């Protein structure tokens, strides 16, 4: 098994001019790439060192605040759901200076695959989702559960 339940993975990124759009704020394509990196790092740690994960789908990604060039952003990541061959991680963008709410939140679903590219069970036993999740993880897990019920 990977990281102990309750552990968070932190990812920090400096927003550079090459990351910006014509408004001088974080470009959506770069945002998606950064979020995917943070989510993959979180899912990899959750699944264990022998993980061979692929992104199945972005369940939800919301950017609540524009991020300017020169700001350092923090992604907090945590596993919020696990099944036989998949792990769902949530991301929470730590509030920017002078703000009280997150600049971003997201949920992404990753699947463990074998050499054939087909799903394979994750290492260790499937665990029930923690019942004692604290904010913001409880709300993100509940939102992910509703979105998982929608088949793509």
Model-assigned labels for residue ranges:
Residues 1-27, 131-152:
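Catalytic strand-loop segment that frames the active site of acyl-thioester-processing enzymes
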Residues 4, 40-76, 80-87, 101-106:
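Hydrophobic beta-strand-centered segment that forms part of the acyl-chain substrate-binding groove
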Residues 12-15, 62, 109:
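Generic structural detector for well-ordered beta-strands
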Residues 24, 62, 117:
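Short strand-loop-strand
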Residues 26-29, 120:
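Short, polar loop/linker segments at the starts of domains and inter-domain junctions
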Residues 35-37:
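A glycine-rich, hydrophobic loop/mini-helix early in the fold
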Residues 68-69, 80-152:
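HotDog/MaoC-like acyl-thioester-processing domains
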């Amino acid at each position: 098994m990977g990281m102990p339940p309750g552990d968070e993975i932190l990812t920090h990124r400096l927003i550079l001019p090459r990351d910006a759009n014509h408004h001088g704020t974080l470009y959506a394509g770069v945002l998606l790439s950064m979020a995917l990196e943070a989510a993959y790092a979180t899912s990899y740690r959750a699944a264990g060192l022998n993980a061979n994960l692929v992104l199945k789908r972005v369940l939800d990604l919301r950017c609540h605040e524009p991020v300017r060039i020169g700001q350092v952003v923090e992604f907090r990541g945590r596993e919020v759901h696990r099944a036989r061959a998949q792990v769902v991680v949530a991301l929470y963008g730590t509030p920017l200076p002078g703000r009280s709410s997150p600049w971003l939140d997201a949920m992404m679903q990753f699947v463990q695959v074998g050499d054939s590219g087909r799903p394979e069970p994750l290492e260790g036993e499937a665990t029930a989702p923690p019942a004692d999740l604290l904010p913001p993880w409880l709300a993100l897990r509940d939102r992910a559960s509703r979105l998982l019920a929608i088949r793509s």
